[in-house]
Amino acid sequence: SINLFDEFIVDLEPQFLLQRSLKGNTKSFVKLGDSITGDKVKRETTLKDYFALNSQIKGKINNWKLETDQQISSFDSEKFSEALRFNSNLSKNISFFNSLWNKSFYGIYRERVWNGSIGETEIYLGYGSKLKKQNTWEVNGIRKTEILSFGFANIKAEALNNNNLVTSTKGNLFYLLDQKFPIIVGEPSNIFVDSSYRYIPKPIKRGLSLQTKLELLYSLYDSGNNQQYVSLGAGPEIVYGNFKKKSFDYTKISVLPIYKIKSGDSPFKFDQISDKFTLDFTYDQQLYGPLILKSSAILNLDSDSKDYGDLINSKISLNWKKRSYEFGIFYQPHNEAGGISFTLFGFK
């Protein structure tokens, strides 16, 4: 990290792309001269393609929080427009209707989006603003999370039915209510964290609960298009163990069927509502000591979809979990992508 002035920090992550250097080619770019939305083809690599750079800038401007992320996947000037990805976000908390909201302005250049059975698509260029309120609270043991947001943006992205780029302004309203109802509760023997809690930052709430999810969305586009849906889901979650013993002392399983009632269409691929019926599944299992296996998947149960019965989103990770941090490697079979994750606990 580099301290830039008093209020800004720059994180730089140079990368050497070993696979490209060994193979001598890459399928990360379109044919020279083709549209940026064209099909990726095999292209020969040079020394400039073996290096990449991820960077992040964080800081404050008066009462606003600024974050920018940049990715450069090649230093070849002929590929630079494809190799560069950028997003920025300027936000602050405000008081609105006697509630605390987060107000943000953002800009995007070439952001990848995975949209269920539609697959990977891309926002080529976009800028906009969002007003969002999020609250989490507990009443009689029932944990609730509520999100309400309003957004307005100008977006250039892949069209819904072809690879052409189309531009449209978009306004949207989104509401979510998650609830977790305890059915069988196993209270921890000690509510205080002591030396026996080597792997977790706080005692685990064991038992059986019913989780429910309600989502509402309405989107309007200047092309005259509009789309909306109501999403309902309910399913069990089981948590067993204390994560204190050496092995197999923690298991978490959740199953959540979700059904969407939708109408209308988007002009874009990235936000088109798809997959009316899905099954969300998660499974976490302590293996030995701080080593934990985590997995999640979304199964497409929409009988009208060409991907009926397929996993449209999936992730497997092997993590090293300690009280103050969690580090792991992950792989996503649905898009054959992987990486490294790192989380700190107890920091805001």
Q: At which residue positions do the language-model features occur?
A:
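Long, low-hydrophobicity, solvent-exposed regions enriched in small/turn-prone and acidic residues
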Residues: S1-K348
